[in-house]
Amino acid sequence: DGIAPQDKGLARKLAIKLFETKQNDDGIERILRINSLREKFGIDDVQAILNTKTPPPALMIPKVKSSEEIVLLDSLLTEKRHNCRLHIIIETNEGLEKAYDIANCSNRIDALFFGGVDMSAELRCENKWEPLLYARSRIVHAASSAGIDAIDVPFLDLDDPEGMKQEAIKAKGLGFSGKGSIHPKQIPILNEVFTPSEEVIQRAKKITSTFEKANTGLVVIEGKLIEKPVLREMYRILAVAKKIEKNNLI
């Protein structure tokens, strides 16, 4: 959206050329955001990606309204033997209604992103937490069903870091695994919110270890009944912590 129509051709060439150079193996994923697959610019973007021998490791797809869009893109990438991962932005009423199908339609998908700005415009509501709570919840439910990440919309006020932090805390509590940013100075705060604390990590280790030793469907830890479905989240926490430690991302 930030590229003027007359500049999209040049931007496309420069973006594709960037990935001709081997990217650093630093644990940070480089994602190329393309145009909507239902627009000519988006089709041109996909064509350029299919024609290159060094595609981006991941693509961000905006304004996705149906699983058919992603299934077609997946097929084209597979035909070219491109291993691009996909990050899907849900920001329309149609996309929200089909979020479950979209999230589960391709093994390439790593995350659903909530596009709150466009969504609020479609819903004719304020771009605030309460009016968009239902839409956010749908994104989390769809992502969870597919076992992928749910990423909340960026906080647009760069001069209100505390407001961003509080919104990020709410998003985490709702089930989001991260939050987008529009400026590097927002990243440390978001990392602070979404990085598992040492206390959370130790609890996850204790729960997983206890279950593995007990070989049963439920255990009692510190007087609380913990059932087996909780294990998935505990293993996710440990996987996140391990990746952060391995790549020194904080």
What positions do the PLM features span?
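Expand to "…catalyze enediolate/carbanion chemistry for C-C bond making/breaking, isomerization
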Residues: 1-250
